């Protein structure tokens, strides 16, 4: 495999964009490679500018649950683009997607469309503060909720990959309004509420952490979070930008049967186009302008292209779709474990729906601290070997793999063979 054109493209890109990329994790720094530049994708496959084909487990970092260039989505996008890309006025397409979201997400009675997951979480935080008339927000260490100032505190994802505890440029007077505690730790959460309970506007959390790898909740943890917020008059915000329509047909909240006050969505609901949304109880959502005093707006919010791609994507998913993906995930996870046993590689695997986290450690991974016990050198060796075998994975230990309805049994078989080869070659 050669990557000469990607190397040349990156040399040009570093003079044009900071680090040569528009999102830090794409720089491939933690795996010791230059970025791979892609040009097209179809189904479960993606092709780089050197014409190397890969089985793709990045899927644009999660949105493409139907795979690349799904014919149903592409056809509808072609039709709507010919009619106009944005109007700055309401369209029926917004109603259509809103109805689907409200129907499938247990917590959402009303929804507001925005343009990114970061916009959704920032807006939900403002809404929670305005609704409760409190300032403090509680989040969990290693959880990434976008790059808004109040949420970029002890974040995971790209921040973890780059080894930064937080980001310069976040003022202390903003950071002090964010409390962090370890994920899956009820004792720390209880203590935080004993100290600050009457000042906490909301807990914002990923019901399954996806930006420290993949870390599901312990049994009863989400139920405890729901209980303690209700007990203290705080709101519970589920950041389901990643888990929404990935963990299940009714999102993670449906799977775990825990209903938050507000939910943030993104990724899958845009079918690969820029999108975000936040929604929840009617009495809370009606506090947003123009019906209420809490302001939020967006020039391209609810634009026809994103609404169309989102509607077609969600309309194409059924309960059976998730059963099929989960069966393929089972096979893939078993392949990882068999290879680890055969070549004596320490691994811990977490999964939630079509999300899979692979950690090179003997420890059970239940939070950010235990996620960081993963052997990053092993991960980098494994990653480079998988790329050479035509398997495209997220270039970070702290991101999960994603599967789609387009992945085939043959894709999984080829991937498992590549895993065996990669694990055999790891230098201990």
Curated annotation (Swiss-Prot):
The lineage of its organism: Bacteria, Bacillati, Bacillota, Bacilli, Bacillales. This is Glutamate-1-semialdehyde 2,1-aminomutase 2. GO terms for molecular function: glutamate-1-semialdehyde 2,1-aminomutase activity; pyridoxal phosphate binding; transaminase activity. Its cofactor is pyridoxal 5'-phosphate. Pathway: Porphyrin-containing compound metabolism; protoporphyrin-IX biosynthesis; 5-aminolevulinate from L-glutamyl-tRNA(Glu): step 2/2. It comes from Oceanobacillus iheyensis (strain DSM 14371 / CIP 107618 / JCM 11309 / KCTC 3954 / HTE831). It catalyses: (S)-4-amino-5-oxopentanoate = 5-aminolevulinate. Its EC number is 5.4.3.8. The keyword Cytoplasm applies. InterPro entries: 4pyrrol_synth_GluAld_NH2Trfase, Aminotrans_3, Aminotrans_3_PPA_site, PyrdxlP-dep_Trfase, PyrdxlP-dep_Trfase_major, PyrdxlP-dep_Trfase_small.
């Amino acid at each position: 495999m050669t990557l000469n054109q990607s190397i040349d493209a990156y040399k040009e890109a570093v003079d044009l964009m900071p680090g040569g990329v528009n999102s830090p994790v794409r720089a491939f720094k933690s795996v010791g490679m230059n970025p791979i530049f892609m040009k097209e994708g179809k189904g479960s496959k993606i092709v780089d500018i050197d014409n190397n084909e890969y089985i793709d487990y990045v899927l644009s970092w999660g949105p493409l649950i139907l795979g690349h260039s799904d014919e149903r989505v592409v056809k509808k996008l072609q039709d709507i683009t010919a009619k106009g890309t944005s109007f700055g006025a309401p369209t029926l397409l917004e109603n259509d997607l809103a109805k689907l979201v409200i129907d499938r997400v247990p917590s959402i009675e009303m929804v507001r469309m925005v343009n990114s997951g970061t916009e959704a979480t920032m807006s939900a935080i403002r809404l929670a503060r305005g609704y409760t008339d409190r300032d403090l927000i509680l989040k969990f260490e290693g959880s990434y909720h976008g790059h808004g100032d109040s949420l970029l505190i002890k974040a995971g994802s790209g921040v973890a990959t780059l080894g930064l505890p937080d980001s310069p440029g976040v003022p202390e007077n903003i950071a002090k309004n964010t409390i962090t505690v370890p994920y899956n730790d009820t004792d720390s959460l209880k203590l935080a509420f004993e100290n600050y309970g009457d000042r906490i506007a909301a807990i914002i959390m990923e019901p399954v952490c996806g930006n420290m790898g993949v870390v599901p909740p312990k049994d009863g943890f989400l139920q405890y979070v729901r209980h303690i917020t209700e007990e203290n008059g705080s709101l519970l915000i589920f950041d389901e930008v990643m888990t929404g329509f990935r963990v299940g047909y009714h999102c993670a909240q449906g799977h775990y049967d825990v209903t938050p006050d507000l939910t943030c969505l993104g990724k899958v609901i845009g079918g690969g186009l820029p999108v975000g949304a936040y929604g929840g109880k009617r009495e809370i959502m009606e506090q947003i302008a123009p019906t209420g005093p809490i302001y939020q707006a967006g020039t391209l919010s609810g634009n026809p292209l994103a609404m169309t791609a989102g509607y077609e994507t969600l309309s194409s998913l059924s309960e059976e779709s998730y059963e099929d993906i989960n069966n393929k995930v089972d096979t893939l996870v078993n392949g990882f474990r068999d290879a680890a046993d055969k070549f004596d590689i320490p691994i811990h695997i977490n999964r939630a729906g079509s999300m899979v986290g692979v950690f090179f450690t003997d420890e059970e991974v239940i939070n950010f601290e235990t996620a960081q016990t993963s052997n990053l050198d092993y991960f980098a060796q494994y990653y480079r070997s998988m790329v050479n075998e035509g398997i495209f994975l997220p270039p970070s230990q702290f991101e999960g793999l994603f599967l789609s309805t387009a992945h085939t049994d043959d894709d999984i078989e080829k991937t498992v063979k590549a895993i065996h080869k990669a694990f055999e070659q790891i230098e201990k």
